[in-house]
């Protein structure tokens, strides 16, 4: 087959690279067929307890009104729990 000019529609179709996800999947599948490494799910890091931001940097926000607390509980004498 002669070299197709790049603007030719067929050339556009053939030159589009394989979607990378698809390429990875086929590679892993081939591995498994060959007895190689089985597909490892991309491991999510273990969800540790989310660290609360340091209390000094927590913005002073109004209290949750559903608890009916007055104003900003950070600086109120009653504290977070009445």
From Swiss-Prot:
UniProt KW Cytoplasm keyword: yes
Source taxon at top rank: Bacteria
Region feature Disordered, mapped onto this chain: 35-82
Record localization: Cytoplasm
Composition-biased stretches (Basic residues): 35-54
Keyword Nuclease appears in the UniProt entry: no
GO annotations of cellular component type: cytoplasm
Coiled-coil parts of chain: none
Keywords: Cytoplasm
Additional notes on this entry: Encoded entirely within Rv1078 (pra), on the same strand in another reading frame.
Designated name of the protein: Protein Rv1078A
């Amino acid at each position: 087959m002669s070299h197709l000019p790049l603007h030719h529609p067929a050339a556009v179709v053939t030159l589009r690279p394989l979607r990378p996800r698809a390429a990875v999947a086929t590679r892993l599948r081939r591995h498994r067929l060959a007895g190689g490494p089985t597909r490892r799910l991309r491991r999510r890091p273990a969800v540790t307890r989310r660290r609360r931001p340091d209390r000094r940097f927590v913005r002073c926000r109004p209290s949750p009104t559903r608890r009916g607390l007055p104003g900003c509980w950070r600086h109120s004498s009653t504290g977070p729990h009445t």
